[in-house]
Design a protein with these regions (language model features):
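A cross-taxonomic marker for long C-terminal extensions/tails that follow the last structured domain
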Residues: 124-138
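Hydrophobic transmembrane signal anchors and adjacent membrane-proximal interface regions, especially
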Residues: 29, 37-38, 77-78, 84, ...
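Catalytic cores of nucleophile-dependent amide-cleaving enzymes
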Residues: 45-128
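A domain-level signal for caspase-like cysteine endopeptidase catalytic cores
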Residues: 1-40, 67, 91
Length: 138
């Protein structure tokens, strides 16, 4: 599943909805306090797309900004099914290593080896899991 955390840049949303569903699953947009439990399979990978930096992801401008701890709370409260064993890929600029390390710390050790981010500026197109751009959170 792709989960889009950008509400002010239509190009991010557009790219999310144009990704190959056989690789990435269906795309959903984040709405505050809206449950997406049931959309993500227990073993399905989760691809998060947004604008980002080493401290936050979300909108390009103001209005939606999530620290790693805030994203972890959203994911555990509204997205991840019980017993989730898939991987989480944060496709946003500069999310590795600091942001995804914070996300791993917030989600806990059960997620070790399953959270990835990106170094530097990235293109809007989400890359498949085996792409060399993904950096594992440590």
């Amino acid at each position: 599943m792709i989960l889009c955390f950008s509400q002010d840049d239509f190009s991010v949303v557009d790219k999310a909805y144009k990704q190959q569903t056989d690789i990435f699953g269906t795309a959903q947009c984040y709405l505050k306090d809206h449950s997406l439990i049931g959309f993500l399979g227990k073993t399905e990978n989760l691809f998060i797309t947004a604008h980002g930096n080493e401290d936050e992801i979300g909108n390009q401008g103001a209005g939606l900004s999530l620290t790693p701890a805030q994203l972890a709370k959203v994911l555990t409260s509204y997205v991840l099914p019980g017993g989730y064993s898939g991987s989480i890929y944060v496709s946003a600029c500069d999310t590795a290593p600091k942001y995804v390390h914070g996300l791993l710390a917030a989600l806990g050790g059960d997620y070790a080896g399953r959270i990835y981010g990106c170094v530097g500026a990235i293109e809007l197109a989400i890359q498949p899991p085996k792409n060399s751009m993904w950096i594992l959170a440590k």
